[in-house]
Amino acid sequence: MNNNKRPLYIPYAGPALLSTPLLNKGSAFSTTERKYFNLEGLLPEAIESIEEQTGRAYKQYQNFENDMDKHIYLRNIQDTNETLFYRLVQNHISEMMPIIYTPTVGAACENFSNIYRRGRGLFISYENKNRIDDLLNNAANQNVKVIVVTDGERILGLGDQGIGGMGIPIGKLALYTACGGISPAHTLPIVLDVGTNNPQRLADPMYMGWRHPRVTGDEYADFVEDFIQAVQRRWPEALVQFEDFAQKNAMPLLERYKNRICCFNDDIQGTAAVTVGSLLAACKAAGSSLSEQRVTFLGAGSAGCGIAEAIIAQMVSEGISDAQARSQVYMVDRWGLLQEGMPNLLDFQQRLVQKAENTKDWVSEEPNFSLVDVMRNAKPTVLIGVSGAPGLFSKEVIQEMHKHCERPIVFPLSNPTSRVEATPNDIIRWTDGQALVATGSPFDPVAHNGQTYPIAQCNNSFIFPGIGLGVLAIKATRVTDEMLMESSRALAECSPLAIHGTGALLPPLEEIHSVSKRIAFAVAKKAIEQGHALEITDEALQQKIESYFWKPVYRRYKRTAF
């Protein structure tokens, strides 16, 4: 809660206080605090404001030439003085978000053991499967409200990184705080170390994780179940976000737990919510509705299928039947268009196959319809890439789409930048500036024929911090599909292009606090409506959201007994 004017009673002093990131003020400790907390002589004489500290930190940051060094520097500040870290990041959010999260966090995960400085969060190894309660009791933060957990098997588009995947929960929770106002004292990153099948990690003498092939099957499922039960015993009201689990586990885990605990999967549901929000904004800018679109996906994994199901749900809410909506969505993977009768489809893919009657008149030289075949025959108006394979939105694909669609909506969403299906610069050139583009990673504006086209980053950070804020502010007990749909609609209402006819599809990151609060309000209202939180007035709800929103300012300290 926001109690910045009230003093905080601290049981630590001396080096112990300076070594506690949540409490350390560094050179901002007052004369009185230095005296009563045994800090005299441990700090330089000057007493600085947080603004002065932030100015120095930013100058130091600017001295680093490559993004990895900048990432390491910011993580060091986070592990030294969290209040200063969040003030610095919030002051330079557009510049620093790509450093603390995608795309730089991908390289940080790959090099996690090599750049390791200090532990953060919890590393729960399969070797300790019978001691999970003890490990949770060791967490530095004990008033935990939100957990981001990964098993490190599908880190962005980089695959199995073992415990290196810890960089993702750390980065995600940094955005919960920087964008959504969740106090860092209430956050906990966790990696479930069930081994790794990455030969590079296993052969690396620096690798710090459990050197063992990945645990799978019933042993894996039982381990996750034991973890969830332990979390429920220790923090029964905590929001659990599943992050970067492999396709074979992501959807089954979500289905197993979404009706048992307060949880969601950001790769599936968060990505779907921000994509639907961006699509709603794009449709409004193009003068149409989502239910009028024909949507093609390249990539039919759990993320792509999750987005597709969210799009279908929104189409149905606009008045068309479920069957009609599904006939307008085309899923393409490495084997071609998902069709009836294809072997080896996963359960969540089965509901998204195209029926034979819908493709019986299509023309193709191959029995399996390729992406270009889908462009020619289905004539889609929306193209979404979640394949993790660079360059697959070729000039032929985009121009074939543009032949029958004046303003194609093209979202190459794969992360990091090296995995993007096509660059915005190419898409804008190939469509002569007519395409509406959003990407998964940050890209600079595109200049074409004397015009500048800002590129929206279809970034989950526009969604999940607001969801977390709304859930925690009213103590919601579940995260439902309907709550996520409301987050999409709230995001679309913030689109500069949809509102003013100019600018990017999504608002600038400098407005992320107001966006997160708007999403939090919409999500919380739906939770109340569905009976997942106590009923309160709109005015009281807004007050709860405002009071819950943490700000990076130093509080006065008073000493209490050890």
Curated annotation (Swiss-Prot):
Assembly mode? Homotetramer.
Q: Which gene is the coding source of this polypeptide chain?
A: maeA
Q: Which GO terms describe its molecular function?
A: malate dehydrogenase (decarboxylating) (NAD+) activity; metal ion binding; NAD binding; oxaloacetate decarboxylase activity
For this chain's UniProt record, which GO biological process terms are given? malate metabolic process
The residue ranges crossing the membrane are: none
The catalytic site is made up of Y101 (proton donor), K172 (proton acceptor)
The protein depicted here goes by the name NAD-dependent malic enzyme
Cross-referenced PROSITE patterns: MALIC_ENZYMES
